[in-house]
Amino acid sequence: VHLNVLPREALLKEIKRILMSETLTIQNETFNNMLADLQITDYTASANVLALVTAESRFIKDLKINVGNALNNTQYLNRKEAVLIALAVAVNEKFVVLQESFTNLAKEAGATDAEIAEVVACTSLMNTNNVFYRFRHFMQKDFYTNQPAGIKMSIMMNPVTGKEFFELVSLVISAVNGCEMCVSSHEQSVLQHGSSESKIFEAVKTGSIIKGLITILA
């Protein structure tokens, strides 16, 4: 950037940006290696990151190990499934840095544009359903329970990711958003479509780890 050609207001803003980027350079090998694993190359440290790095917190190592294990678990989730679940949580939490990261990683793992779009759509639908059905569950009134939902859910029919995985993503997001009725319903559906409790356990654990990662990075 040629600072001498910028208007005064823009000049001050650019100088502040440069100073901030230099000030917030993260001098922690473990943390930087985690960012590299996630293919995050342009990141401005959050206050939470700075707190951990400044104190040389042991949690940084825990976080890196947990994230690595979650995304590379091949016993019950393959790489593509794990990254797509992580993407769903990033979308749910509106954290663009990880949304872009997991989109790229998902494509590297073989996910198609249609599968990625479906995960985004599924996450949006779950945000709708989680609020609606949590309200019904809270109120426990016949009137609300018996009223037709009137919510279009065509993406649940013949999903490109398959019924089992679509329901699995729905379950994870419902767990993140705290909808008991939705969690119970989707857990039963995942099992009915041939999945196992072990896979469900790993999927929800993956979602919880990514939620924790976002708490630090955002």
For each of these PLM feature ranges, what is it?
Residues 1, 109, 182:
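Functionally engaged cysteine thiol sites
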Residues 85-102, 173-185:
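Short, thiol/selenol-centered motifs that function as redox-active sites or metal-ligating centers
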Residues 149-181:
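Acidic/histidine-rich alpha-helical segments that form the ligand environment
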